[in-house]
Amino acid sequence: MNTRLWLCAATTFGLAAAISGCSSVEQSRAVETARPVSASYAYQGPRSPISVGKFDNRSSFQRGIFSDGIDRLGSQAKTILITHLQQSGRFNVLDRENMTETRQEAGFNRQEQAIKGAAYVVTGDVSEFGRKVVGDRQLFGVLGRDKEQVAYAKVSLNVVKVQTSEVVYSVQGAGEYSLSSREIVGFGSTASYDATLNGKVLDLAIREAVDKLASGIDVGAWKPVP
């Protein structure tokens, strides 16, 4: 009996020592960010000064009865659009979101601002956005199951001429992202909710729309004035 107690105590102590001896491993790496395809092509034409106007979420996503009324998706889309417009190399993008901060810094430097006006304003909407979870089961789930998260986004962009308020060019972009994993006979990982899919699919749809804007300039479908 004493021998059994001693063995149990030794085993428990050994497990505790093994657990306490484990150390966490911290890993990090830089992840390459995607740029518009148009950014990889040299452009020698005129760059029109543009600003980004309203960008609203017109989809049903985050607009239910329990919504707080803050358009986070539209705000995120606007930031992404400004970045990709500048990266495309076809435009001189003017920032209108930080006017107070730039005015303050100019005052600190005792400089007078010379704010440049835009020839065009790009407005946009997230017209479609949604997520769904799909899956299948092998032999009624005995042999495993697959769970896949799918996010879809569609955006619309309109280029408005400041002088006349005329919509001179319009494009749409759409994208889909999915995340899946398979669990086989109780082993493996399942696809838990990944909130980053929202940003990834929105970025993809906007990149496609910006590439269409740039392509329109390259083929002469519309000619922005410098």
Residue ranges and their predicted role:
Residues S23-V25, E101-V168, S178-S181, F187-S192:
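Surface-exposed short loop/turn segments
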Residues V168-Q172, R207-E208:
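Juxtamembrane/interfacial segments around transmembrane helices
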Residues P49-D56, I80-H84, N92-L94, A119-S127, ...:
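Soluble periplasmic/extracytoplasmic beta-strand elements of cell-envelope proteins
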Residues A16-I19:
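Bacterial Sec-type N-terminal signal peptides, specifically the leucine/valine-rich hydrophobic h-region
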Residues C22-V93, N98-A106, R110, L179, ...:
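A structural "domain/chain start" motif
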